[in-house]
């Protein structure tokens, strides 16, 4: 069983046609809505100014000034490249906007819906800036539609997908591996219409140090193509402390007329806790709704996403129990990658991007010897 913390959760990379994020500097004036990068505990994070900050007030680091700065999350301090469209909608610009228009805010990497017709004097702040205006009317100009297309693979959700029409799609991003952030594995969730995935990892000199391909993601079931996996796992435990570039190439399955789709990419530290015992139980939480008309008995359906719940027992050694339990508790309050596959299996349904609802360690004895941890893991919503 493998447990992995995802360093890419909330990744806000600087993509093509998107302005770079400057480093925060004390004592320098910052205009309203400007974004700055600041490293917290070894991890670079992005911040956006709620207001115009004069030089004399810009003395406290963004992470310690929540009234001045909006935390945008981990940004990776890298350039993100992809051939997927940044957004399905046109870029926001000043000028008159018709009600019902959806536009892409490149500063926030999100799409926004215009709630009302805006005149040129009204449409001077970007949608993300309007959301934090002190004027209630201005806050109501736009409605947040969520993360834009190219960035959905890094938004920490598997049901929002990055899409590209064509025979393939790629993404490329950097990762600085050191004591504060390590890559032991790469997981891809929420794949659709994909027949193979290739992972290449390049060092700072441009030499490939990893080159792995997972294929045969589809098989025939009585003549019909069937998807074998919605997720994949790559092992990158051989990487040493250095700066790397990760590139993932997704190839569309033969005959597919729709787009290549990826839900989420996870890169991070992985911990192998021990083998999963036989008797694992899997069930799904179905959030769809069915309603029957009381007069005629007709049934209407509202299709929604599902979430998996995995109940499993993992074997370990009693001397390791303190370390394991402390590690699990250290990452509470957020989603992790849970992979209950053993070394000889690679089942998609035994992987979850979610959280531990409950875990316990029933000691069979206090002496050195075998022990076990019982997990109940609930995944986030899939197939939304």
Where are these regions (language model features)?
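Tryptophan-rich substrate-binding surfaces of secreted polymer-degrading and adhesive proteins
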Residues: 1-155
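Extracellular/virion structural assembly segments
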Residues: 1-17, 145-211, 215-384
């Amino acid at each position: 069983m493998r447990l992995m913390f995802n360093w890419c959760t909330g990744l806000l990379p600087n993509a093509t046609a998107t302005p770079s994020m400057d480093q925060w500097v004390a004592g320098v004036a910052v205009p309203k809505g400007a974004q700055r990068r600041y490293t917290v505990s070894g991890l670079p994070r992005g911040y956006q100014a709620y207001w115009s900050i004069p030089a004399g007030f810009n003395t406290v680091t963004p992470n310690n000034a929540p009234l001045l700065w909006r935390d945008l999350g981990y940004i990776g301090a890298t350039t993100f490249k992809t051939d997927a469209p940044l957004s399905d909608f046109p870029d926001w610009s000043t000028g008159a906007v018709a009600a019902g228009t959806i536009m892409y805010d490149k500063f926030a990497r999100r799409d926004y819906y215009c709630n009302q017709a805006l005149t040129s004097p009204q449409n001077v702040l970007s949608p993300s800036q309007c959301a934090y205006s002190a004027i209630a009317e201005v806050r109501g100009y736009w409605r947040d539609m969520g993360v834009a297309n190219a960035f959905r693979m890094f938004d920490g959700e598997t049901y929002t997908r990055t899409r590209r029409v064509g025979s393939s799609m790629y993404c490329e991003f950097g990762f600085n591996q050191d004591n504060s952030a390590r890559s032991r594995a790469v997981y891809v969730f929420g794949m659709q219409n994909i027949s193979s995935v290739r992972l290449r990892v390049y060092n700072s000199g441009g030499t490939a140090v990893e080159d792995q391909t997972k294929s045969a993601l589809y098989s025939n079931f009585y003549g019909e193509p069937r998807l074998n996996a919605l997720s994949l796992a790559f092992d990158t435990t051989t990487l040493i402390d250095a700066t790397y570039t990760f590139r993932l190439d997704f190839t569309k399955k033969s005959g597919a007329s729709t787009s290549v789709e990826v839900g989420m990419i996870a890169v991070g530290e992985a911990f192998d806790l021990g083998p999963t015992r036989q008797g694992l139980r899997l069930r799904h939480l179905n959030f769809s709704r069915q309603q029957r008309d009381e007069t005629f008995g007709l049934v209407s359906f509202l299709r929604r996403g599902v979430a998996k719940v995995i109940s499993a027992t993992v074997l370990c050694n009693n001397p390791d129990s303190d370390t394991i339990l402390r590690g699990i508790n250290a990452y509470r309050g957020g989603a992790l990658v849970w992979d209950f596959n053993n070394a000889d299996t690679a089942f998609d349904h035994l992987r979850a991007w979610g959280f531990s609802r409950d875990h316990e360690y029933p000691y069979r004895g206090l002496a050195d010897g075998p022990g076990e941890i019982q997990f109940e893991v609930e995944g986030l919503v899939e197939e939304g």
